[in-house]
């Protein structure tokens, strides 16, 4: 699923009676994600939410048709960089968005932002480097800095009297950030830590044996997508679900739950967006997504939806004239749109200042596996790296 996906732009043009020639006057957005391989479900969730955002906008921003160009990074940093180059140099997009993986985003950042005319609106990955020393005037995030979500979980565990914790995550940029995040706020004893091979390792039996021997009050993990599915299954198979409570970030969600099923019931996670947040924009987004796709959206999708709405807010404010990049950046920084998370504001490093919530894995009234909000862990949370950013 690579190259131009003309469906969105073409449908928008036809719906409003616009000739194909007007494609030159479109707002053109490149979207880099993983659309093949074992993690393709995440990319599909993001794509669905982008398409829904375009539908909610009536196919236009500031009177111009929206054109989305999807590219598959194949779960590889070098491929992600190549696809980003194509979007900027060949497709001449106004914006590039997407990026699930921190290593893919880090490989692609300069390729997109150093051109000067292209804005990168990251919809998921939030590596610490980009929040700090590598912050960039042409980069905006609609997600979070990697450390923040586990920091929220650490704060929550302190309130619940969890006295000892075992940490596990993959050995790459995001995994290191996630475990650093929970270490930053958790005040109990960390009695073990394992970084597993990424992305090849899907067998966690050796590490789980170490967890069983350590007998912590809980285990904290970060294993997104297919890795989270395997971890939860093996945690239960090892019998640890009866003795070691599981606390997680990005490991149990709308994408993984159809495969994890009841094995994940009762587990707790942290996130900046949950599908039951009560604001009107979120209610519409979740209801329309479920109606269209027969499943719940995930935070990957919610952040992608917000990325399109953020871009639309700036385009509308500038009446479709995206030529003045200083004005464009100023409008993006206002974050003047109805976010599905209920609103946020940008810090100086262009990462959101926002709330983080604790969610429990449950069954809904129809028996579908989902998550529900049980607590607000952090209000107006800032990341830990913004002071290292040269932007003020």
Map each language-model feature to its residues.
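Extracytoplasmic "Venus flytrap"
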Residues: 30-49, 71-78, 100, 168-176, ...
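Extracellular/periplasmic periplasmic-binding protein-like sensory domains
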Residues: 234-305, 316-322, 365, 371-392
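Extracellular/periplasmic Venus flytrap/periplasmic-binding protein
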Residues: 82, 128-131, 136-238, 275-284
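Periplasmic-binding protein-like
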Residues: 87-100, 119-123, 164-169, 215-225, ...
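Bacterial N-terminal signal peptides
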Residues: 7-17
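Solvent-exposed, acidic/polar segments of extracytosolic/periplasmic ligand-binding ectodomains
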Residues: 27, 333-392
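Beta-alpha junction/loop-to-helix N-cap segments that form part of ligand/metal-binding clefts
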Residues: 41-48, 56, 60-130, 142, ...
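Sec/Tat signal peptide C-region and signal peptidase I cleavage site
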Residues: 18-23
